[in-house]
Amino acid sequence: MKIRSLLFAAAFLAAAPALADTWSRNGAEALLKTWCDALVKYQVGGTGDAALDGGMLCPACCFEHGRAADSVYALVYEWKRTGERKYLDAAERVFDWTGRNMVSYDGANYNDVKHYWRGITVFSQTSLGKTLIAFGGELPQDLRAKWLARFRVQTDFLVGYFSKGLGDSNINYPITFCEAMAVAWKILGDDAYKAKGDAMFALVRPLFLECGLLAGEGHPSTGISPRGCRPIDLGYNMEESIPALYHYAELTGRADIAKDLDRLVAGHLEFILPDGGLDNSMGSRSCKWTYWGSRTSDGLLPALAHYAKHGGKGAVRAIDRHLKLLAKCTSDTGLLYGGLYYREAGEPPCIHHTFAHVKSIVDLLLAAPPEKSADEPLPREEEYGRRSFPDFATELAAVGPWRASFSANDNYSNRGPVNVGGGSPTMLWHRDMGVVAAATMFSYFYAEPTNFQDQRRYIGVETLTPRIDCEGFSNVMDAGAKTTADFSGGAFAYSAKGVLTGKDGAKGAPFEIAYRLDAKGLSVRARAEGKFRYVFPVVATEKDEVVVEGNTARVKRPGGTLTLTADREIKLLDTQRGKRAFTPVAGLMAAVFYIEGEDGEAGLSVVVE
């Protein structure tokens, strides 16, 4: 582990009494400072070019992302905490750069140069508004006046932009509009803003599902797929929508919806892994999954903070685990990586993750939830067997040391081959080893051009979803696959039956897959007509020892040795990297194992020794 990571670990390892959960405020402050210092470091200056000076240069994307002024909230917080003027200066410079380069004729902010999506004005307005609410009285008078003027213009734009209700945008936008109107009401004092936020909330409320999840991250937000799936994305829900609703409720005094929001957090907490990661492998916007959350949303700490303040079970532990995960995923340059193994893959961090998620630490610190609670396990630390979420065709399994998710979800926000379903295991996690396998988008492409990262030196990205493959056809793309799930005798069983499908929807041969997970491990039986491969990528860095001998393969990782045994020869895929594949989705690196079959069944098992 690098020196910076060791320092973070020391900050977070504050003494905790036995049988109690704690999170470290000092550790959160340290991480916030590291991220703010990195943002200051990457801020452009001295060129004399108004199109460049004040923006923040991204080492991964090699340009200045348009939403960098969202960081004003955190930079001003750090100025107040430390008294160091550099943070306030950086906030003013990035705000001014945005005004010169990222504001359209009607006062809206847009996403990036050449990416004129203006809905993100709602995030710019709420970030600026929260800054004015928390620190406006302490800002220099001329600076406050300048920021307040921009806030008014943004607010006026939003009122018109969201005048048609939910529209066709993902639900996090109308939800954040509720927050934006509450913030405007708080700052400007006009009751009309509160009324508009309340009216929008009335449209949003029906998307709170009985299962404890929030629907709406899709087009349309109220849509239901042929399978009956709702557009559910755990990342955007926990990192954007639920925090915005908590803030809306807090500002407007809507105590009546606090219990509903707590129930949503409890439902989404089912998908928090024991290491603080968020299993959004199967979500409707899983193409933006980062393991700790989602690429360009704001962070799940505020949702956990409010839930903890309301006595939510497991909230304090979740805050602690998640903060430690964020620290682990922070680079030596001080920027947040978009997943687990970017460092090991030699890929730089995109600055967007940092300037977006730094806000969530400020929200956590200002909310000041309890730093200690009784010892309360996270739901996925419990060995409960099986839990079903039919609203997006997903099954969770908790058996012995294993935690898994399987999905046949067919409702995705982004058009294109982003699928991870078709009756696939989307997460296989082990108590001692962490992530063993996970699903990632079937064919990697820039679903949102300026919001996606690619490999610096390698062309093409392998999907890491365990699957049947046959010359471009796969079970993963079969939206109509029939699935079954059962838990009995200490084992979870899951099966899928359908037609191998290409990324353009073309149909191929029939297939069947059966999975069985017990305390020992996972077994797979795959069947298809004609020649096929069953592919099972195992998370492994280039430092992890991989040995393939006939029908057996072993992966030695910290925490144990994973052994794959098949009824035929196991092969290891050659890639441009050699014997590993890397995907920007969740930042996973893997050894891609496969077995070959023809007109019959092929079997494989996975255990940890």
Regions found by a protein language model. Name each.
Residues 8-15:
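Bacterial N-terminal signal peptides
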Residues 21-23, 69-85, 123-142, 176-191, ...:
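Well-ordered alpha-helical scaffold segments within catalytic/enzyme domains
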Residues 256-259, 269-566:
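Extended polysaccharide-engagement surfaces of secreted carbohydrate-active enzymes
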Residues 141-221, 228-229, 234, 250, ...:
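Eukaryote-skewed repeat-based solenoidal scaffolds used as protein-protein interaction platforms
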Residues 41-69, 105-123, 159-175, 211-240, ...:
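Solvent-exposed loop and edge beta-strand segments that line ligand/cofactor-binding
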Residues 20-70, 77-103, 152:
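Low-complexity, Ser/Thr/Pro/Gly-enriched N-terminal "stalk/linker" regions
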Residues 1-7:
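Bacterial N-terminal signal peptides that target proteins for export
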Residues 567-609:
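Beta-strand-rich recognition/accessory modules
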